[in-house]
From Swiss-Prot:
Belongs to the methyltransferase superfamily. RNA methyltransferase RsmG family. Keywords: Cytoplasm, Methyltransferase, rRNA processing, S-adenosyl-L-methionine, Transferase. Signal peptide: none annotated. Pfam families: GidB. InterPro entries: rRNA_ssu_MeTfrase_G, SAM-dependent_MTases_sf. Its main location: cytoplasm. It comes from the Bacteria. Its EC number is 2.1.1.-. S-adenosyl-L-methionine binds at residues 89, 94, 112-114, 140-141, 159. It comes from Trichodesmium erythraeum (strain IMS101). One of its GO terms (cellular component) is cytosol. The gene is rsmG. This is Ribosomal RNA small subunit methyltransferase G.
Amino acid sequence: MNDNNIQVLPEMSSVWQETLNWQPTVEQKQQFQKLYELIILGNKKLNLTRITKPEEFWEKHLWDSLRGIKFILENKIHWSEEKKVIDIGTGAGFPGLLVAIILPQYAVTLLDSTRKKISFIENILTDLNIKNALTITNRVEQIGRLFKYRETYDIGLLRAVASTVVCAEYALPLLKIGGIAILYRGNITTDEQANLPEVVKLLGGKIERIEEFKTPLSNSIRNCIYLRKVGKTPINYPRSVGVPNQKPLLSLKKI
């Protein structure tokens, strides 16, 4: 792991505290650094991320991943709860790996359809000694129809996966009633805001809140959309592999 080209992540203790009302432990900071090193090295073989500079990596991967669960971080009561989490389309492991690192009581499932990326993440789990995470190589449309996974999870995480309505169709079938899906977004379009409530209702959910915020270093606008599962998702959702993305529910409404 000694690579002279790999730099050290910035400390940022005060920024963690000011923005998330939370700070990582010394051990967690060490895990963040090792995760950074593993991803930079893995990037030489796999197309994991274009974000490689330490400050950018801290802001756009570490901080951004944890901003979505700020409501958990700032209330220690949640830390000891045993929750089941699924990171849908985990890619290089964000935000799911971060959740597994800082919330060891949570059982985190990292889902991706690309076997090479899942193999890489499995090596990370071993190298970082993360015991509370497992991986699945599959399409979300397929596992969303399986009894083993459907209505199983307390929290669904979706970051840089698809449009909001597609993410809703991916996530809500997997959530227990009372569960929450967290959609990590940049800007939200007017069309998304107009169409999402009806689509979410169809899938057994409701929009609990939308949080707009700026990132602490680059002042980029970001949004997190929180969808609460309030009723059963109709059995015909999610639709077959590829269909949610090719024919989003919002477009079907207009036909």
